[in-house]
């Protein structure tokens, strides 16, 4: 099952860190752009080649120390068909090195449309899991759940997102006296019963932001079946302490995504005097090792088992 494979990958890499491949052309090292533009021209094709080459460097540097990568489709979709090619090529390369691939596509929509989104991603062998948006209601996520079970894939449903504005709707109190995100959490946890693996977690998981540690603590209890995909670590302000309550005492229960803080580590105050732009991938590796060490130390301090 997807979730068992994910847990086994976390165990074998001894890391719950997911690297987010969200490349920006304006932050891409010049030497990569030079290579890409020379090969494909200083145009959309060249830009997309540069994004792919950048990702390839990161993947080469981290594939042996993380269980998965998360690829945010917006950074590719912005460039049309060439962007999509870079998106698929990135997924293909990550898979070829044994990484699990989460497509961050946050899909939703009415059932008939959701079926087509699901066909695009969950029926595609390149992707192990996708993110979905359940805020249109249960019927809209069932096509993804059905395909996840049928094709042995995973889904992570948005429950409490990491952005500031997540409170605008997700934190409204319902007539039952709970927050909207808790109602969504209850729905997802119930649905997730249909896909529980041998470690007690389901292939139907939840997105819970690192920037809301109190809410995450509540949700960990209210969603015992659901593995959390936790964005918001690093660049958005989430810290190791903030994510601790996403884990269970066996050191499972969560994968922690970091995109900018890892892929652009060489530009951060911590690493910028150590690594040049030519060494951006080594900097990303160093940041993942540091992040993994800090998370595992945090787990040990709590007397939880480290990953
Ligand atoms: O609640 C959410 C859900 C998804 N994301 C995604 O995670 C990364 C975060 O990038 P950073 O550079 O580490 O901030 C990005 O792909 C978002 O789409 C999120 O941030 N919050």
Curated annotation (Swiss-Prot):
SS bond partners: none
Membrane-spanning parts: none
Record-stated family: Belongs to the OMP decarboxylase family. Type 2 subfamily.
GO molecular function (one): orotidine-5'-phosphate decarboxylase activity
Reaction catalysis annotation: orotidine 5'-phosphate + H(+) = UMP + CO2
Biological process annotations from GO: 'de novo' pyrimidine nucleobase biosynthetic process; 'de novo' UMP biosynthetic process
Annotated pathway: Pyrimidine metabolism; UMP biosynthesis via de novo pathway; UMP from orotate: step 2/2
Protein origin, superkingdom: Bacteria
UniProt cross-references to PANTHER family, sorted A to Z: OROTIDINE 5'-PHOSPHATE DECARBOXYLASE
Keywords: Decarboxylase, Lyase, Pyrimidine biosynthesis
UniProt-listed Enzyme Commission number(s): 4.1.1.23
The keyword Ion transport is annotated on this UniProt entry: no
CDD domains assigned: OMP_decarboxylase_like
Active-site positions on this chain: 106
Protein name, per record: Orotidine 5'-phosphate decarboxylase
A Pfam family: OMPdecase
